[in-house]
C-alpha cells in the first residue's frame, strides 16, 4: 500500500521507528556515490544496518542477505542499468520490501526510462521530490536532484505514481 505523506503523523511514525530499532534490519543499498555516507548514517540513526556495494555484479547475491533494499538512481551507470533490475528481481523473489529513490529523474532519457520500468516492479516506497514525481508521471521533470516544482503541483502526479506502484 502506498501512502502520500504530506504532514507525517508522529503517532504513526513512532511504532515504525520502534520496530526498526527492535529488528535492526539489514538494508542493502545501491546508492549514489555522493550520498552513500549520508544514507548509511541515516539508516544507522534509525536503528537499521546499512550494507553498501558499488559492484553491481554481486548486488543480486548480496540482497539475499538483506531484509530490505534501497535503489537510488542518482549516479546511474551502464552497469547500473543492467545490475539494478536483477537486484530488484532477487529482492522481490525473497519478498523483501524495496525503496526507489529516482534521483534526478526526468533530466535524461535513460534514467527516466529506468525509473519508469522500476515503478512497474512495485516498490514499497518511492522517495521523490516534486519534480521527480512529475517526471515519473510523464510530466516535466526538474534540472537535477533539486526540485524546481512546488509540492502542491505534484499531488495529482503523486497519486498517479501511487496507483502504479500499488
What are these regions (language model features)?
Residues 25, 44-45, 69-74, 96-102, ...:
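Short, basic, glycine/proline-bearing loop/turn elements
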Amino acid at each position: 500500500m502506498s501512502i502520500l505523506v504530506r504532514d507525517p503523523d508522529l503517532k504513526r511514525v513512532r511504532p515504525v521507528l520502534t520496530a526498526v530499532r527492535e529488528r535492526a534490519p539489514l538494508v542493502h543499498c545501491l546508492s549514489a556515490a555522493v550520498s552513500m555516507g549520508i544514507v548509511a548514517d541515516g539508516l544507522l540513526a534509525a536503528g537499521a544496518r546499512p550494507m553498501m556495494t558499488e559492484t553491481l555484479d554481486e548486488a543480486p547475491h548480496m540482497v539475499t542477505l538483506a531484509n530490505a533494499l534501497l535503489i537510488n538512481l542518482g549516479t546511474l551507470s551502464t552497469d547500473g542499468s543492467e545490475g539494478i533490475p536483477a537486484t530488484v528481481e532477487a529482492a522481490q523473489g525473497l519478498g523483501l520490501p524495496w525503496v526507489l529513490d529516482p534521483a534526478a529523474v526526468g533530466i535524461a532519457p535513460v534514467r527516466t526510462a529506468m525509473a519508469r520500468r522500476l515503478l512497474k516492479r512495485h516498490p514499497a516506497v518511492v522517495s521523490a521530490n516534486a519534480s521527480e514525481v512529475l517526471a515519473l508521471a510523464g510530466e516535466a521533470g526538474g534540472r537535477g536532484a533539486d526540485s524546481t516544482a512546488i509540492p502542491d503541483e505534484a499531488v495529482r502526479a503523486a497519486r498517479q505514481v501511487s496507483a502504479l506502484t500499488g
